[in-house]
Amino acid sequence: MACNQLKTAGYTIHVQAWNVDANTDIEQVLQREGVEKCNVIFGPLYSKQVKPLADYCKSRRIRLVIPFSITGNEVASNPYVFQVYQDGARLTNAAVNAFLERFSKCHPVFVDCNDSINPKGAFTAALRKQLDIKGVSYNITNLKSPDDAFAKAFSATQPNVVVLNTARSPELNAAFVKLERLEQLYPGRVVRLFGYTEWLMYASYDFAHFCKYDTYIPTTFYYNGSATATQTLEKSYRSWFHEPLMQALPRFAITGYDHAQFFIRGILQHGNQFTGNRWQRIYQSLQTP
């Protein structure tokens, strides 16, 4: 769809596609006619294929865009590799830094939600470690604490920023009830929320609460279903494939559309000088910068 739109804009694009499964020898695929003429290759899906494909692209000055969740660090040593996927540790560090930057004047309140799996423990532990290093005081409370004990964790003189240790919807909704009770019993407390990317899935029914508590959600994408450009693309998708977009976040089809538009436009505009930096951006993404 992205290539079709670019063609209507006057660009000439030739597309080749290869179905390369996990057991395929990528070296054999690279010997096929036409591969060496590519300006950009999107893939691979499997980590073991990254190194030979990256080496091939480097030797022929072909851009390699890896949008999938692979392991490896070719992006650090190969200037022709663009690795879109970021591992959990990198995203956690980015979220911690975003918190420290935006809430330096706030009082952090960590709420234990009694989630036995607790997949967000890595984030809360990393954030608390940085707060300790910086000498920032914070309080810890529990979602099941009595109202008076819960309230003691909150500052009456500073804005409070609440961090839950889970991204699950039931616990989030229970936290909203707890915060509303706090507001009733102790009016005047300023409360904000720092959440998780998963919370974007709850926006359709939690939007009012998100606004009420000035919620910040760290994310590498944003799907705006109300945007005219997004609605136009979704209509076109239904026309092409006779079904709506998969209900997932991010919308994978829009991710692919954004990637194709960004890299193809960039290469056509800047040629071998294209590095993908912000000064070369000539496309406004719909969802994924």
Predicted regions and their residues:
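Extracytosolic ligand-binding ectodomains
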Residues: 1-289
